[in-house]
Amino acid sequence: MRSLIAAVERIDPLTIYGRVAAVNGLLIEVRGGLTRLAVGARVEIERFGQKPLPAEVVGFRETRALLMPFGPVEGVGPGAEIRIVPEGAVVRPTKAWLGRIINAFGEPIDGLGPLPQGEVPYPLKTPPPPAHARGRVGERLDLGVRSMNVFTTTCRGQRLGIFAGSGVGKSVLLSMLAKEATCDAVVVGLIGERGREVREFVEETLGEEGLRRAVVVVATSDEPALTRRQAAYMTLAISEFMRDQDQEVLCLMDSVTRFAMAQREIGLAAGEPPTTKGYTPTVFTELPKLLERAGPGPIRPDGTTAAPITALFTVLVDGDDHNEPIADATRGILDGHIVMERAIAERGRFPAINVLKSISRTMPGCQHPHERDIVKGARQVMSAYSNMEELIRIGAYRAGADPVVDRAIRLNPAIEAFLSQDKEEATSLDDSFGMLGQILQSEY
C-alpha cells in the first residue's frame, strides 16, 4: 500500500505537450512546450500503433528543441505529441537487486521476474561529492589477484583504470575481481559490449558465485548512444545507493571508452564541433563528472563518513596506443593505471599485466616497509631482465658479464609463474607478498 501511495504522489497533474516538427538523422525537432523543456529533460514521443518512444533533450535550435531518442524512430511522424516526463531520469534501487541483470532503464533482462522498487529516487546524473566534504581513501583492499595485490596495491575508495587493447583478457580480469575482491557489493557496467558476449560473461566468466553479490547493468553495442551513455550513469547511481546502505562497493565498468564514444555521437548529432580524433568538447567535460562519482564516501552531517566506492574502469586503447585522447584524459583523472599488453597475452601469461608500467598512486602509503622492499626488489629484477631481454633471446648476452642480469635470468621463470594466475584461483594480500618474497630470497 505504501508503494502505491508513493506512486500516486509522484503523478504530475500538469502535462505539457509539444509536437514533432521534423526528424533529421538521429535528431527529432520539436515545436511548442519550450517553457518547460531544458537540456537533459526526459520526454515521451507518441508513435502510431506503438508504445511511446522515450527521448532526451540534447539542445535547442532557434525556437525548436532537439531530442535524441532512446530507440528507433520508426512510427514517429510530423505532429506526433510530446509529453514531458516530470520525474526525470531517476532509478529506485533496493538491495534485492543483487544477483540481477538489468538494462540501462533499470528493467530486468534476466527473465527472473520484476524488480522491487525502492522508495528513494536516485538521479542517474548527480554531481560528485565536494572535495572538502568527502573522506580519504581507506585501508587497503584485497583484490585476490597476485600481480595487482603486490604491484598496484589498492586502497578502499581508490579508482583505477585498466588500459588494454581488444582481446587481451580485460573481461576475465574483471570477473576475477568481482568474485574475489573483499567487498560487500559489486556493480558491473557492461557498456557497448557485443551482444553475444553478455550471457557468456555472466554465466561463464562471472559465474553464479560472482553474480550472487552483484548487479550487472548491460547496454550492448547495437543500442542507441543515449542508452549506452545512460548505462554508465545507471552503474554509478546503483553504486551510490549501495554506498548509502553502508555497503563497501566495488564498481567495475567496461568500458569508459565506449561511454566516450557514445557521448561523441550525441555531441556530433547536436552540432558540437569535433576536436581531437573527432571527440567533442562535452566528452572531456563528462568524463571527470562520471569518474569522480566513485571514490571515498561523503562526510555525513554527524561527522561519520559513508562507505567508499572502489572503482576499476577499463579503457579500450585504440590500436594499442596508450596515449590516445581518452586514455590520456582518463589516466589524468584516476588514482592509478593497470596496463595490459598484447605481447604478454600472446606468450600465454594471464592476466597480461605489465607490472613495470602499472602504477597505484596510493602506494607506498598502503604498504608495510618490508612489503615496499619486496616490490622494489622485484621491480629491479624485472627491469634488469626487460632491458636485456632481446640480447638474452638471441644469445648475445654472455653469462657472468653482469651479476644483476645473471640473477634476473635465474629469477625470471619464477616471477613469471607468480604473475600468471588462473581465473578460478585467488591469492590473499599477505600470501601474495609472501610468495614473491620467497622467490626473491631464492636462487634458480
Curated annotation (Swiss-Prot):
| Residues that, per the record, bind ATP | 164-171
A Pfam family for this UniProt protein?
ATP-synt_ab
- Which keywords fit this entry according to its UniProt record? ATP synthesis, ATP-binding, Bacterial flagellum biogenesis, Bacterial flagellum protein export, Cytoplasm, Hydrogen ion transport, Ion transport, Nucleotide-binding, Protein transport, Translocase, Transport
Q: Identify a single GO molecular function assigned to this protein.
A: ATP binding
Q: Does the keyword Cytoplasm apply?
A: yes
Q: Supply one GO CC term from the record.
A: bacterial-type flagellum
Give the matching PANTHER family.
ATP SYNTHASE, SPI-1 TYPE 3 SECRETION SYSTEM ATPASE
The name of this protein is Flagellum-specific ATP synthase
